[in-house]
Amino acid sequence: MTLTFQYLVDTAPQVVKEKLEQLKTLRERPDYHPEPSTYHHIEIVVNRLLQTGDPDLAMAGMLHDICKLDCVKIHPKHGHPTSPGHDLAAFDLITQTPEVQQWIHDNGADDAKVAAICLYHMRFHQLGQMRPFKREAQIQKWTEQGIWEKLQYHGAADNMLVEFDMDDLDKSFKFNK
């Protein structure tokens, strides 16, 4: 079976389906997210990542922003919704919910890697703000965990400001701008 976004939605555990449905109402900061809702953002990210043929990436795409509505606050400076801690909340959802873990496995992915990609997807976008020593240490840690390459693909797919190009991931990295 070839994975598709709709297949993943249709086979998702009820908790994931409910969160996805609720995310159709969350409009994020338009200068970073021109898409109409977080649900649409997730759909775009998943469709980009499905091109890689890597189920870990497809499942991380489905789950990386799944808890945004649970963590949403209005940013005091710009007035747009922000969701601090949504990465940790997604990690917790995966690691603490057996039916989510089973769904990940049923789709050929590794729940530990999917959880780690979700946990670190925001930190990945902050690499450019780190001192070189700290950045290299973080990359080494992710390499040892077997997720560094996956984070690069995920980071590129998660960037809505440029077209996703699997053959030129660097152009998508926010920390290169």
PLM features: what roles do these ranges have?
Residues 1-74, 78-79:
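Acidic/His-rich, divalent-metal-binding segments that scaffold phosphate/diphosphate chemistry
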